[in-house]
Structures are given as structure tokens and as C-alpha cells.
């Protein structure tokens, strides 16, 4: 079929450019240092291409995205990068893909309780680093980690998203450093081996 014969609307991917982008990002963040976000591509085929390049850890914004990745066998290390209080959805995810390693973001006692009730075993403490959307204030990160551990959860570390800086045109590098300093401070309170942050718009500025 020729491209002009495709029914529209149609999503067309230039595989040569895609592979070049994967290789470029992988050179900066090799292997599991890069955690691709499923909401950006919503395709298990593309996820498999990333996994074949060594990027076997993924995150998603919804329970459904994680379930889709796990169903495709891409379940080594999945992060639900969103705070969920719907216990039923969490329980359905855990029960549906029992072999998957699933980590959930938490930022409050309520989300910690939901994680426990939903059968989640591991969490990251989500920290607000400048974008007023979600995440605890950095000074509360240690307290929340203690609460999560007291409830029997494994706390793997912290996550934060400097989304407000993705298109910043003035002093982006300095502002990214400020945001990441908040995340690193929170990690100092929380511990763990994961510090998750960054995005396409700031990846060249993140050197932590």
C-alpha cells in the first residue's frame, strides 16, 4: 500500500528517525537509566522496540497503560507515575498481572492507604518540584516514606516532574538545577535507589 492510499486519519512513523532518536537518547541515558513514558506513544510495538534497545523499564499515567505493557510481556519494572486512590483499579492491576513488578507514586497518607489496600508492594514518594499539580512538598517526603514503610510498603526512592520547565526559554538549565535540587533533597530524606525525573524538554539539562 502506498502512503497516499492509507485511510485517514493515520499515524505514520518514520522508523529510521525513530531508531535514531532512540539511539541518541540511549547514548545519554543507557539501559534502565531511561524509563520511557507509555503515554507518549501508547503502542506496545514501540515499547518492544525500546526494550530491544535495552530500555526495559517503563512508566505510565494510567492503570490501563501499565496493564497493556504487562500483557505484552514488558513487565520487568513498571511505574504508575500517578497518584491513585481507586483501590479497585489498583487491585485489578495487581491481580491481573501478578508476575509484574509494579511501583506506584504516592504523595499523601491517602494514596499510601490506597496502595496498601490495593495490594501494591512498592512505591516512590512523588515530590512537587515547581509544577503545582501533585506531589508532596519536599520537606514532607521523609515523613511519608516512614509512614509507607510502617504500612509494609517498600519505598524505592522519589520521583518528581519539572513539567513547567519543558518549554522554558530563559535560563532553563539553572531552573532545572533548582527543581532537581528539591528532588535530591527529598531523596536524602527518603533513601532508596531510584531518583526519577526529567522529560523530553529538559533531558539535555539534567546532569544529576
Regions found by a protein language model. Name each.
Residues 46-50, 70, 89-94, 112-120, ...:
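Distinct, well-ordered alpha-helical segments
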Residues 33-35, 56-57, 77-79, 101-103, ...:
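Structural preference for beta-strand elements that scaffold enzyme active sites
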Residues 18, 39, 69, 115, ...:
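Conserved, mostly hydrophobic/aromatic
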Residues 120-122, 128-208:
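Active-site loop/helix belt of alpha/beta enzymes
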Residues 41-43, 63-64, 83-85, 107-111, ...:
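Active-site beta-loop-alpha junctions enriched in small/polar residues
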Residues 79-80, 86-133:
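A generic, well-ordered mixed alpha/beta core segment in the N-terminal half of proteins
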Residues 21, 25, 46, 65, ...:
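A general structural detector for well-ordered alpha-helical segments in enzyme core domains, enriched
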Residues 1-95:
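A charged N-terminal "starter" segment
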Amino acid at each position: 500500500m502506498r502512503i497516499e492510499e492509507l485511510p485517514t486519519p493515520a499515524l505514520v512513523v518514520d522508523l529510521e528517525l525513530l531508531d535514531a532518536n532512540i539511539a541518541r537518547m540511549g547514548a545519554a541515558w543507557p539501559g534502565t537509566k531511561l524509563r520511557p513514558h507509555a503515554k507518549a506513544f501508547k503502542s506496545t510495538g514501540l515499547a518492544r522496540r525500546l526494550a530491544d534497545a535495552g530500555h526495559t523499564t517503563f512508566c505510565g499515567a494510567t492503570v490501563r497503560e501499565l496493564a497493556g505493557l504487562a500483557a505484552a510481556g514488558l513487565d520487568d519494572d513498571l511505574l504508575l507515575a500517578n497518584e491513585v486512590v481507586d483501590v479497585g483499579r489498583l487491585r485489578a492491576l495487581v491481580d491481573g498481572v501478578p508476575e509484574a513488578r509494579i511501583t506506584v507514586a504516592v504523595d499523601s497518607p491517602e494514596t499510601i492507604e490506597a496502595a496498601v489496600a490495593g495490594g501494591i508492594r512498592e512505591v516512590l514518594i512523588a515530590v512537587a518540584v515547581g509544577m503545582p499539580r501533585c506531589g508532596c512538598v519536599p520537606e514532607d517526603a521523609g515523613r511519608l516514606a516512614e509512614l509507607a514503610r510502617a504500612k509494609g510498603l517498600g519505598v524505592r526512592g522519589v520521583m518528581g516532574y519539572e513539567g513547567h520547565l519543558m518549554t522554558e526559554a530563559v535560563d532553563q538549565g539553572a531552573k532545572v538545577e533548582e527543581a532537581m535540587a528539591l528532588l535530591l533533597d527529598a531523596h536524602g530524606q527518603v533513601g532508596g535507589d531510584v531518583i526519577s525525573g526529567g522529560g523530553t524538554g529538559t533531558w539535555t539539562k539534567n546532569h544529576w
